From Swiss-Prot:
<dbReference type="Pfam" id="PF06455">
    <property type="entry name" value="NADH5_C"/>
</dbReference>
<dbReference type="Pfam" id="PF00662">
    <property type="entry name" value="Proton_antipo_N"/>
</dbReference>
<keyword id="KW-0496">Mitochondrion</keyword>
<keyword id="KW-0520">NAD</keyword>
<dbReference type="GO" id="GO:0008137">
    <property type="term" value="F:NADH dehydrogenase (ubiquinone) activity"/>
</dbReference>
<keyword id="KW-0812">Transmembrane</keyword>
<keyword id="KW-0249">Electron transport</keyword>
<dbReference type="InterPro" id="IPR003945">
    <property type="entry name" value="NU5C-like"/>
</dbReference>
<dbReference type="GO" id="GO:0045271">
    <property type="term" value="C:respiratory chain complex I"/>
</dbReference>
<keyword id="KW-1278">Translocase</keyword>
<dbReference type="GO" id="GO:0042773">
    <property type="term" value="P:ATP synthesis coupled electron transport"/>
</dbReference>
<keyword id="KW-1133">Transmembrane helix</keyword>
<keyword id="KW-0813">Transport</keyword>
<comment type="function">
    <text>Core subunit of the mitochondrial membrane respiratory chain NADH dehydrogenase (Complex I) that is believed to belong to the minimal assembly required for catalysis. Complex I functions in the transfer of electrons from NADH to the respiratory chain. The immediate electron acceptor for the enzyme is believed to be ubiquinone.</text>
</comment>
<feature type="transmembrane region" description="Helical">
    <location>
        <begin position="268"/>
        <end position="288"/>
    </location>
</feature>
<feature type="transmembrane region" description="Helical">
    <location>
        <begin position="552"/>
        <end position="572"/>
    </location>
</feature>
<comment type="similarity">
    <text>Belongs to the complex I subunit 5 family.</text>
</comment>
Length: 573
């Protein structure tokens, strides 16, 4: 089943890519209307939008999904339910495709809810308590976005149609469109895990690693970014863009800090995804939707590769994800290590890899844009933190000696897994330049002073040195961090967001409810009122019932007892 799915998906992906090139070069957009039901004067019509953006994004989703399924053939080989796993992944991709090609909020909701439902099934695929909790957190966080999307659909009834694409430019300054835009932004923030809905994304790492490679590169988390790209006109002409810039910038900063304190391999990569999602959202909020789309596509390539390499490492390390137990993997697993390092360097923005073209352009656009000093600081400091945790990850996993048990035998994975990784390695190297020439065919003139041009390079070098220094001085930094335990805990636990959004949301209401129950429902009024009366009467009834059902000797004893009382009464008279 893996091979058939791989061939079908890669064929459709290639077709979509060629069509997107044709549409892009000829500046074409196709609307296809399918009349689902026609009864008297009533008809239900489903509309599909095909332009270069939807087709290109769909081709990337299908390509990554095909390689992930091919990779899963070996990774999930020992799993008895691998066919169920492949079916879930295909349902996930189908939901994403429906969301991509829909210009209608109702059909978008079908794909949106499909993503949420199937992601829950995939997160709880390994059946244990941790997976169940992570799945419930993922589902409930995304429910908020679903409700926001339903409210946006209800508000669009004012227009008589749910095809938002026709109203964006005409109604962009109206209050009703602002309300719809704010609800859609809330939905996108939950799906793309922006503050304050960030806690579900690292928790979703309980899913199998191939799912993480698909979910955190091109499908679930990027659905919110893609939806906001479609609604970019409403964001760029209102205060919603400024609010989104603040929240996404803080998300980027928070995720970068958290990743530098984390030791779980998959969680570090998940936090880096969160940081890059904040980068996409922030540049989108400034009105550069093509640039956000560009970074979304390049990020999909190297992040899927990074997760695949992490899966291969975890597979070899007997399912251990602690980077402190790794080391010297470049000697034992050279091909996997090469892919891992290339994807890490692409994440840092190494020149001429996929991430360089989009990240460098974003930082240069930020430098010439009219934004405040705080946002400027968040952009560049977060970039430095990205390089820092990437170098820290490479240091712990690739250098030195192996820190786990000496009986472990490490080697590169079989060619089935390596072929999937090498396909994405090729795209991570050439994908950035290819997309740059396609999406931005004409050169942009960005005039910057020398110190601003060199600022990006300086921030990356300082970030890399910082990551290396905190890695080699781990014992010293551990002792120092214990002196500032509360600060370390705050920075390393995503600013207490997992506690606030889970335990913190229910602790005080439940505690207050328990107090109310004890004070009123089970308090003194109940004790001296109905409950006490019921308790006394039931006790008396039980005693009488016991006496009534007992043997004959009790009746005789009572008879003798009453006769004695009667005689004593008569004697004293």
């Amino acid at each position: 089943m893996c091979s058939i799915s791989f061939i079908n998906l890669i064929s459709i992906s290639l077709t979509c890519f060629l069509l997107s090139l044709y549409y892009l070069l000829n500046n074409m957009v196709y609307f296809i209307e399918w009349e689902v039901v026609s009864l008297n004067s009533m008809s239900i019509v489903m509309t599909f939008l095909f332009d270069w953006m939807s087709l290109l994004f769909m081709s990337f989703v299908l390509m990554i999904a095909s390689l992930v399924i091919f990779y899963s053939k070996e990774y999930m080989e020992s799993d008895e339910n691998i066919n169920r796993f492949i079916m879930l992944v295909l349902m996930f991709v189908l939901s994403m495709m429906l969301l991509i090609i829909s210009p209608n909020l109702v059909s978008i909701l079908l794909g949106w809810d499909g993503l949420g439902l199937v992601s829950y099934c995939l997160v709880i695929y390994f059946q244990n308590i941790k997976s169940y909790n992570a799945g419930m957190l993922t589902a409930l966080s995304n429910r908020i976005g679903d409700v926001a999307l339903l409210l946006a659909i209800a508000w669009m009834l004012n227009y008589g149609s749910w095809n938002y694409i026709f109203y964006l430019e005409v109604m962009q300054n109206e209050f009703s469109m602002l309300m719809i835009g704010s609800l859609v932004m809330l939905a996108a923030m939950t799906k793309s895990a922006q503050i304050p809905f960030s806690s579900w994304l690292p928790a979703a790492m309980a899913a199998p690693t191939p799912v993480s490679a698909l979910v955190h590169s091109s499908t679930l988390v990027t659905a919110g970014v893609y939806l906001l790209i479609r609604f970019n006109i409403v964001l760029s002409t209102s205060w919603l863009g400024q609010l989104l810039l603040l929240l996404s910038g803080l998300t980027m900063f928070m995720a970068g800090l958290g990743a530098n304190f984390e030791f779980d391999l998959k969680k570090i990569i998940a936090l880096s995804t969160l940081s890059q999602l904040g980068l996409m959202m922030s540049i989108l909020s400034m009105g550069f939707y093509k640039l956000a789309m560009f970074h979304l596509l390049t990020h999909a390539l190297f992040k899927a590769l990074l997760f695949m390499c992490a899966g291969a490492i975890i597979h070899n390390m007997n399912n251990s994800q602690d980077i402190r137990l790794m080391g010297g993997l470049s000697i034992h697993m050279p091909l996997t290590s090469a892919c891992f390092n290339v994807s890490n360097l692409a994440l840092c923005g190494m020149p001429f890899l996929a991430g360089f073209y989009s990240k460098d352009m974003i930082l240069e656009i930020v430098s010439i844009s009219n934004i405040n000093m705080f946002s400027f600081f968040l952009y560049f400091f977060s970039t430095g933190l990205t390089v820092s945790y990437s170098f820290r990850l490479v240091y712990y996993s690739m250098t030195g000696d192996l820190n786990c048990g000496s009986l472990n035998m490490l080697n590169d994975e079989s060619w089935v897994m390596l072929r999937g990784m090498l396909g994405l390695l090729f795209m991570s190297i050439i994908g950035g330049s290819m997309l740059n020439w396609l999406i931005f065919p004409f050169p942009y003139m960005i005039c910057l002073p020398g110190y601003l041009k060199m600022l990006t390079l300086f921030v990356c070098i300082v970030g890399g040195l910082f990551g290396y220094l905190i890695s080699i001085s781990n014992l010293y930094s551990l002792n120092k961090s214990l002196l500032n335990y509360n600060l370390t805990l705050f920075l390393g636990s995503m600013w207490f967001m997992p506690y606030i959004s889970t335990y913190g949301m229910i602790f005080y209401p439940l505690n207050y409810g328990q107090l109310v129950v004890k004070s009123f429902d089970q308090g003194w009024s109940e004790y001296f009122g109905g409950q006490h009366l019921y308790y006394k009467l039931s006790n008396y009834s039980k005693t009488l019932f016991l006496m009534h059902n007992n043997s004959l000797k009790i009746y005789l004893m009572l008879f003798v007892f009453w006769i004695m009382i009667l005689f004593s009464f008569l004697l004293f008279l």
